[in-house]
Amino acid sequence: MKAFLLVAALAMLFVLGPVLAMRPSPRQGQLARLRARAVAAGLRVRVEGGRNPGRVADYVLPWRLDDLQQVRGLRLVLRRGDDGAWEDAESLAAPAGILREVCEAVPAGVSALRSIDEGLAAQWNEKGRDEDVERIRDAL
């Protein structure tokens, strides 16, 4: 009888072990929440491949069809330096006052703002609160 219970317990461990291992970690759950909230807010999330722990994701506000003529050829690249100050990486076509407001509105984890073919992108480390997604959307 003891041997049967031992075998049954071992079998349960073999069944439950992989199931418990498939549960997402708290960080993975947070990322899923942030990305779902971004999609619901009208943003697209682009994550580069790889398992680099310092990676960032692009939160992209897509161009609207009526914007396409005005923004074709727009090149905007702003990077946040190590000291937290924004640096102009290329010549800017937008008025400086608007850019200053945008730079102040984004969360601290945003390391770059740029225009890409899909729309305006904020490069974010995704370390923040759920409300930061709306701050990014509103700033873009």
Regions found by a protein language model. Name each.
Residues 52-135, 139:
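Structured extramembrane domains adjacent to transmembrane segments
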